[in-house]
C-alpha cells in the first residue's frame, strides 16, 4: 500500500501545505537601498528606489486586508461546495457537477479543500460511495490541473492530475490510520459512555466507508489495480505482536473491499493471487479466536465468490436511486402506485392539501418538503442530509400514517386512528377509496410474504425456524448509532424484523383489485424493557496477580488443570495483562520441584489451546522474567537453567518455535540461555529430532553468540563445551579431516576414515564437498609453501613447487572422483571451494588457472561444471569477480573447443 499509493504525493496535507499559497494575496516587501550602496555610483536598472515608510505601512495593511478577504472568499467557496454535496442525488448529478466545477477552483489550496469535503462526505455516507466516486471521476477529468504538463505515461493508463494525486494521498492517509479512532475507544478499560459509543460507531462507519470508497474508485480505474492488491495484502497479513482476535477491524475492511471491487480483481491474470487471498480467508473463517460476527462476514464473502460475485437480493438495492426508480420499486414490491408530480402549480396529493384538510395536517407535512410529497416521514427514524435523505428500506404505506397509535406505540390524539390524522373528511375519503382496508390488513399481508424470505438470507440461516406472528414488529429499525441501552422516548422496546426478513418483491395486482397489504387488528407484541444491569468493571492489575497466585498455588498442590484453566477464564482479564499473569505463573514455580515446573508449563500450553493466551503472550512473559534474572539469581542461582526448561517445553508443545525464541536472544543476549534451551531439548527428546528441527528453523548459530565469539572456530569450541557439536557435523568434520590428512595423506586411509566417521547422507551434501576440497587445498598449499617460508603471493612459484603441487593433487584424485563423479552440482561446489581458497590467500599468481587446468586434464571436473560455475550469479562466496577475470580467457577457449568437437562429431 505504502509504495503504490505514494505516487499521489505526501500522505498528509492541510490548508497551509503544498503550492496553495502561490495564488494567495500579493505581498509586497520593497527593499530599501542604504546610502552606502550607491555612494558615488549610478544605481542599475534592477535597483529598487527608496520608498517612504508610510507607503510601506500602507502596502502592508493592504496585503493583510487582501489576505483576510482571500480567506473569506475561500470559506464562501467551501460553504457552497458543502451545499452542493448535500443536494447531490443521481437525478441532479450532471447539473451539480457543473455547479461544483464553477464554484471557483482556481488554486491548489481550493482543490485540496474540495477533495477533503468530498472524501469526508463519502466516509460519512458509505451507502452513496458509488455516487461520490462518479463525482471524483468527473472532477479528475474536468478539474483544473496545477501540476503542469507531465511526462507521457504508458498507453491505457490514466494521466496523473493534481486532483487524482491529492485524492489518492488523502485516501492513503485514511487507510494507514484506519483503526486509530476506533482503537482509542477499544483500549478503554472502563465501559464506554453513550456519547463515546456513538463516537466509536461513527469512527467505524468512516473506516469502512473509506475502504468502500477506495473500492468504488477502483471500479472506475481512478485507483490502479496494484494499489487495491496492496490494500488487500495489508489487511490480510498477520502483524507482529498482534493477536488474531485483534484483527477483526482489518478483516471487516477486507470483506468490504472484496464485496465492492472483488469482481473487477477476479480475472485470469490475478486468479492465483485471489485464490491465495480466499484460501487465507477460509482458514481465518475456521479460527475460534475471531469473533463470530467476523467469521460470518468472511463466510459471506467466500460464498459471494463461489456464486460468481452475484450478491443476494438483500444487497442488490442499497445504492442511490432516482425518484422514478423508487416509484417503480414501490409498485413492484408493495403494489402501491405513487403518481408522479402533476403540472406546474398542482400537487399529486391534491386531496390531502385541499381546503377541507385540517390545519394540523398541513402543518405536519409542510416542513418535510421533497420526500413528504411522496411518502411522508418515516416513523421512528430521521431523514438525514445530502444523498442520505433516501432510506434504504421503507414502506410507502407505513410512511403515510406516522401519527397512528399502532406505528408509534402511543396515542397522541383523542380522535380515532383514521380520523386522528386526516380529520373527518380525510377518513371518509380513505374509506371511499378502500385505503382503510389496506391500512388494517398490512400486517397480515406482510406475514404472508415472509414465507419467501429464505432467498434473501445467508445459507447458514436458511434452516432456522420461522417467525411467529406475534414476534413481528412493523416499526423500522432504529439508527445503529444509538446506544444499545437507549430507547427513543415514548416508544416501547419491541422485537425488530431482521433486514433479511423484509417482504420479497411481488407482482403488481391486476387492474381494479385493491392490494391486500393491511394490518392485523392485533397490535404487535411489546416486550418489557429489560432492567438495566450495571456492568462490573474489569479487575485491576493487582487483583489479577493475586487471583493468579491463588489459582496457580492451588493447581500446583492439587494438579487439577481444568479447574485452573476455568479459574483463569473466569478472571476475564484484559488482554494486555495476560503477559504479566503468565510471568507470575513462571516465577511461582521456579523455586519448586521439577514436577511443579512441568505442571506450570502444561498449564500455559493448556491456556494457549483454550484460546485464553497466545504465543506472543508467552514470549512477552518469558522475556519479562528474563529481565528479572539478576534479582531472581540471588535466591535461585540456577534460574536460567530453569527458564531453559520452560522454553524447551514450550517448543515441544509447539507454543513457540525455535526461531521465535532465538530472535530476542541474538548477539548473545542472556547468553548462554539459548544453548541451555537446546541442551534441554536434546535431553527431553533426542539428538536426531533436535538436529532436524534446528536445521528447519534456519537459525544462524553464530549470531546467537556474543559478538567477540562470532567465528567458526570459537563457535565449534563453545558447542563442544555444551555437548551440542552434533548440530553441526560438517563444522566438526572441517577441523578433524584436515588433521587426518596431515596424519596420513594416503587416499585409501582418507577414504576409509570418511566412510567410518561421516554419515552416508552427507556424502552428497554440497557442504561436505566444500569442506573436503578445502581440506585438500589447504594441505597442498601448506606442503608446497610451508608457513615458515615468506613467499610473495605475486611472484610465480618455481618449477619444483609446480610439480609437487601437481603430484599431490594427483594423489587425491581417486578420493575426489569418488565423491564428485557424475554430480555436476557437487563439482560446482568444488570450484567454489577453490575460489574461496584463492580469495583467502589473496589470489596467488596463476594458482586459480593452474588448478582449473589440472581439474580439467585429470577429469576431476567436467566441462559442464566449469561453464555452470561461470554462469552462476550467487553472492554466497566471495571473490567471484576477480576469479572470473583470471580464468575468463581459458573458459572462452573451453567453450570454443567444445563447439569444434561437436562440429567434428557432426561431420
From Swiss-Prot:
Modified residues (N-acetylmethionine): 1
Chain positions found as N6-methyllysine: 431
Record keywords: Acetylation, Initiation factor, Isopeptide bond, Methylation, Phosphoprotein, Protein biosynthesis, Repressor, Translation regulation, Ubl conjugation
Superkingdom, natural source: Eukaryota
Segments of skewed composition (Polar residues): 503-516
Post-translational modification: Phosphorylation; hyperphosphorylated during mitosis.
Cross-linked sites for Glycyl lysine isopeptide (Lys-Gly) (interchain with G-Cter in SUMO2): 575
GO cellular component annotations of the record: adherens junction; cytosol; eukaryotic translation initiation factor 4F complex; membrane
Modified residues (Omega-N-methylarginine): 360, 505
Residues with PTM Phosphoserine: 11, 395, 443, 902
Domain annotation MIF4G: ranges: 78-308
Annotated spans, Disordered: 1-71, 498-541
Positions of the MI domain: 543-666
Gene3D superfamilies: 1.25.40.180
Phosphothreonine PTM positions: 89, 508, 514
InterPro entries named in the record: ARM-type_fold, Initiation_fac_eIF4g_MI, MIF4G-like_typ-3, W2_domain
Pfam family, one: MA3
Residues covered by the W2 domain: 720-904
GO molecular function per UniProt: cadherin binding; mRNA binding; RNA binding; translation factor activity, RNA binding; translation initiation factor activity
Tissue and organ distribution: Ubiquitously expressed in all adult tissues examined, with high levels in skeletal muscle and heart. Also expressed in fetal brain, lung, liver and kidney.
Subunit and interaction comment: Interacts with the serine/threonine protein kinases MKNK1 and MKNK2. Binds EIF4A and EIF3. Interacts with MIF4GD. Interacts with DAZAP2.
Family: Belongs to the eukaryotic initiation factor 4G family.
General remark: This gene has been shown to be extensively edited in the liver of APOBEC1 transgenic animal model. Its aberrant editing could contribute to the potent oncogenesis induced by overexpression of APOBEC1. The aberrant edited sequence, called NAT1, is likely to be a fundamental translational repressor.
Function according to Swiss-Prot or TrEMBL: Appears to play a role in the switch from cap-dependent to IRES-mediated translation during mitosis, apoptosis and viral infection. Cleaved by some caspases and viral proteases.
Protein name per Swiss-Prot or TrEMBL: Eukaryotic translation initiation factor 4 gamma 2
Gene from which the chain derives: EIF4G2
Amino acid at each position: 500500500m505504502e509504495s503504490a499509493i505514494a505516487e499521489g504525493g505526501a500522505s498528509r496535507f492541510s490548508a497551509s501545505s503544498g503550492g496553495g499559497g502561490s495564488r494567495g494575496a500579493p505581498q509586497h516587501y520593497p527593499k530599501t537601498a542604504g546610502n552606502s550602496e550607491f555612494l558615488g555610483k549610478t544605481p542599475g536598472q534592477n535597483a529598487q528606489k527608496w520608498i517612504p515608510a508610510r507607503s510601506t505601512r500602507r502596502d502592508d495593511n493592504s496585503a493583510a486586508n487582501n489576505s483576510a478577504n482571500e480567506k473569506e472568499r475561500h470559506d464562501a467557496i467551501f460553504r457552497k461546495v458543502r451545499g452542493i454535496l448535500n443536494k447531490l442525488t443521481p437525478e441532479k448529478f450532471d447539473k451539480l457537477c457543473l455547479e461544483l466545477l464553477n464554484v471557483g477552483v482556481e488554486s491548489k489550496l481550493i482543490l485540496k479543500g474540495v477533495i477533503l469535503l468530498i472524501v469526508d462526505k463519502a466516509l460519512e455516507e458509505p451507502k452513496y460511495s458509488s455516487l461520490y466516486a462518479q463525482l471524483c471521476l468527473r472532477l479528475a477529468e474536468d478539474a483544473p490541473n496545477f501540476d503542469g504538463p507531465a511526462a507521457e505515461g504508458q498507453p491505457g493508463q490514466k494521466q496523473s492530475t493534481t486532483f487524482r494525486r491529492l485524492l489518492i494521498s488523502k485516501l492513503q492517509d485514511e487507510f494507514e490510520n484506519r483503526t486509530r479512532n476506533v482503537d482509542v475507544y477499544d483500549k478503554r478499560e472502563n465501559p464506554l459512555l453513550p456519547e463515546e459509543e456513538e463516537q466509536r460507531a461513527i469512527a467505524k462507519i468512516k473506516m469502512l466507508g473509506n475502504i468502500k470508497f477506495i473500492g468504488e474508485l477502483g471500479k472506475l480505474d481512478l485507483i490502479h489495480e496494484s494499489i487495491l492488491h496492496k490494500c488487500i495484502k495489508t489487511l490480510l497479513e498477520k502483524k507482529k505482536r498482534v493477536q488474531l482476535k485483534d484483527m477483526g477491524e482489518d478483516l471487516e475492511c477486507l470483506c468490504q473491499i472484496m464485496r465492492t471491487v472483488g469482481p473487477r480483481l477476479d480475472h485470469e491474470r490475478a486468479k492465483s493471487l485471489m485464490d491465495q487471498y480466499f484460501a487465507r480467508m477460509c482458514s481465518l473463517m475456521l479460527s475460534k479466536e475471531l469473533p463470530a460476527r467476523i467469521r460470518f462476514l468472511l463466510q459471506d464473502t467466500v460464498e459471494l465468490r463461489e456464486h460468481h460475485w452475484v450478491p443476494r437480493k438483500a444487497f442488490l438495492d442499497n445504492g442511490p436511486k432516482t425518484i422514478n426508480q423508487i416509484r417503480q420499486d414501490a409498485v413492484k414490491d408493495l403494489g402501491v402506485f405513487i403518481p408522479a408530480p402533476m403540472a406546474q402549480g398542482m400537487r399529486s396529493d391534491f386531496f390531502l392539501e385541499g381546503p377541507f384538510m385540517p390545519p394540523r395536517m398541513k402543518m405536519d407535512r409542510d416542513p418535510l418538503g421533497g420526500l413528504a410529497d411522496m411518502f411522508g416521514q418515516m416513523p421512528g427514524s430521521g431523514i438525514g442530509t445530502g444523498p442520505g435523505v433516501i432510506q434504504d428500506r421503507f414502506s410507502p404505506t407505513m410512511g403515510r400514517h406516522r401519527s397512528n397509535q399502532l406505528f408509534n406505540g402511543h396515542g397522541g390524539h383523542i380522535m380515532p386512528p383514521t380520523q386522528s390524522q386526516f380529520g373527518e373528511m380525510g377518513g371518509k375519503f380513505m374509506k371511499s377509496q378502500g385505503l382503510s382496508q389496506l391500512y388494517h390488513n398490512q400486517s397480515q399481508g406482510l406475514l404472508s410474504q415472509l414465507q419467501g424470505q429464505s432467498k434473501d438470507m445467508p445459507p447458514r440461516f436458511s434452516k432456522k425456524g420461522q417467525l411467529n406472528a406475534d414476534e413481528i414488529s412493523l416499526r423500522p429499525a432504529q439508527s445503529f448509532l444509538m446506544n444499545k441501552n437507549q430507547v427513543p422516548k415514548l416508544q416501547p422496546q419491541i422485537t425488530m424484523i431482521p433486514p433479511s426478513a423484509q417482504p420479497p418483491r411481488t407482482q403488481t395486482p391486476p387492474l381494479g383489485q385493491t392490494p391486500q397489504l393491511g394490518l392485523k387488528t392485533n397490535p404487535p407484541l411489546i416486550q418489557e424493557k429489560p432492567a438495566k444491569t450495571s456492568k462490573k468493571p474489569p479487575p485491576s492489575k493487582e487483583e489479577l496477580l493475586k487471583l493468579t497466585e491463588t489459582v496457580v498455588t492451588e493447581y500446583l498442590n492439587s494438579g487439577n488443570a481444568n479447574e485452573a484453566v476455568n479459574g483463569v477464564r473466569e478472571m476475564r482479564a484484559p488482554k494486555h495483562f495476560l503477559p504479566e499473569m503468565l510471568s507470575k505463573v513462571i516465577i511461582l514455580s521456579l523455586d519448586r520441584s521439577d514436577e511443579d515446573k512441568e505442571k506450570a508449563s502444561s498449564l500455559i500450553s493448556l491456556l494457549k489451546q483454550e484460546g485464553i493466551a497466545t504465543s506472543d503472550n508467552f514470549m512477552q512473559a518469558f522475556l519479562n522474567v528474563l529481565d528479572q534474572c539478576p534479582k531472581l539469581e540471588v535466591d535461585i542461582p540456577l534460574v536460567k537453567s530453569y527458564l531453559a526448561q520452560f522454553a524447551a517445553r514450550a517448543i515441544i508443545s509447539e507454543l513457540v518455535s525455535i526461531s521465535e525464541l532465538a530472535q530476542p536472544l541474538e548477539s548473545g543476549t542472556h547468553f548462554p540461555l539459548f544453548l541451555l534451551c537446546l541442551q534441554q531439548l536434546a535431553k527431553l527428546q533426542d539428538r536426531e529430532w533436535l538436529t532436524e528441527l534446528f536445521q528447519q528453523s534456519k537459525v544462524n548459530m553464530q549470531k546467537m553468540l556474543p559478538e567477540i565469539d562470532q567465528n567458526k572456530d570459537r563457535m565449534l569450541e563453545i558447542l563442544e563445551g555444551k555437548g551440542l557439536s552434533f548440530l553441526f557435523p560438517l563444522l566438526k568434520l572441517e577441523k578433524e579431516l584436515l588433521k587426518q590428512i596431515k596424519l596420513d595423506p594416503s587416499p585409501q586411509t582418507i577414504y576409509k576414515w570418511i566412510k567410518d566417521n561421516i554419515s552416508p547422507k552427507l556424502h552428497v551434501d554440497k557442504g561436505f564437498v566444500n569442506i573436503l576440497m578445502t581440506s585438500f587445498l589447504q594441505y597442498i598449499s601448506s606442503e608446497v609453501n610451508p608457513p615458515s617460508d615468506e613467499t610473495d603471493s605475486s611472484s610465480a612459484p618455481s618449477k619444483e613447487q609446480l610439480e609437487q603441487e601437481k603430484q599431490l593433487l594427483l594423489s587425491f584424485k581417486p578420493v575426489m572422483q569418488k565423491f564428485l563423479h557424475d554430480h555436476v552440482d557437487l563439482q560446482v561446489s568444488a570450484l567454489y571451494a577453490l575460489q574461496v581458497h584463492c580469495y583467502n590467500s589473496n589470489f596467488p599468481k596463476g594458482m586459480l588457472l593452474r588448478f582449473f587446468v589440472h581439474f580439467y586434464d585429470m577429469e576431476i571436473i567436467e566441462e559442464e561444471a566449469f561453464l555452470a560455475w561461470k554462469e552462476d550469479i550467487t553472492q554466497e562466496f566471495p571473490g567471484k569477480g576477480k576469479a572470473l577475470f583470471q580464468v575468463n580467457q581459458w573458459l572462452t577457449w573451453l567453450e570454443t573447443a567444445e563447439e569444434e568437437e561437436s562440429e567434428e562429431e557432426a561431420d
